[in-house]
């Protein structure tokens, strides 16, 4: 799968606006900071066809909506509870599920999915449970992880991943939409070495790369005092 990063910026999400019930979530989808995150989801959905995409962490459904951009794919999205400001016109290729995917005994769907989008508790525990399950069962698809710099636990989890991984923070979630205006980060885990990244003609902003550097430094010093439990 060839991912041409400059093409991510060309994704037009305006047609999705009428599927969202309130202005707050319209702004999440269509305005900075954060729009490049949804552009990336929409772009990735169009790179695969007739496939299952699993999202872990629905919230209002804006990410699921972006993932549904390719109508040939089925999106199974999971969250522990519904959101009162959810999408009102849910596309027919999105199926919403309430509950932990493991508690619902739906975890085999992870192995069937070509793409998994992981955006859950940001404490590293559930994220690590998913990663261990995928490795144990020889998953061959792609895992997209949201907010890899959200906090120290997420960064330790991301850093401990031994599979091939690609940091895409400079293209998505590098606009200061994390805690206290920091970047929150995006990463891809490529379990079968199927991704070819073309980052030509993409300017890596000095401000974003500088923030990444200082966050890594901050979390490194914190890790001296915190035992890293994310081993896979």
Task: List the predicted regions and their residue ranges.
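A short alpha-helical cap/connector motif
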Residues: 1-117, 121-144, 148-232
């Amino acid at each position: 799968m060839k991912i041409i990063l400059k093409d991510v910026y060309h994704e037009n999400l305006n047609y999705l606006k009428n599927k969202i019930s309130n202005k707050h979530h319209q702004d999440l989808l269509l305005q900075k900071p954060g729009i490049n995150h949804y552009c990336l989801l929409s772009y990735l959905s169009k790179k695969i066809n007739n496939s299952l995409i699993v999202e872990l962490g629905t919230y209002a459904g804006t990410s699921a909506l972006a993932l549904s951009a390719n109508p040939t794919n089925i999106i199974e999205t999971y969250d522990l509870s519904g959101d009162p400001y959810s999408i009102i016109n849910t596309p027919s290729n999105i199926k919403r599920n309430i509950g932990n995917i493991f508690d619902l005994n739906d975890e085999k769907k992870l192995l069937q999915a070509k793409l998994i989008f992981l955006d859950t508790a940001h404490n590293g525990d559930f994220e690590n449970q998913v990663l261990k399950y995928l490795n144990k069962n020889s998953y061959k698809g792609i895992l997209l992880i949201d907010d890899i710099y959200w906090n120290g636990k997420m960064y330790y989890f991301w850093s401990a991943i031994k599979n091939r991984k690609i940091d895409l923070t400079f293209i998505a979630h590098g606009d200061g939409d994390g805690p206290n205006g920091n970047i929150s980060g995006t990463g891809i885990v490529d379990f079968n070495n199927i991704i070819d990244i073309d980052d030509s003609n993409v300017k890596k902003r000095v401000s974003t790369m500088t923030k990444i550097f200082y966050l890594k430094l901050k979390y490194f010093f914190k890790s001296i005092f915190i035992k890293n439990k994310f081993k896979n």
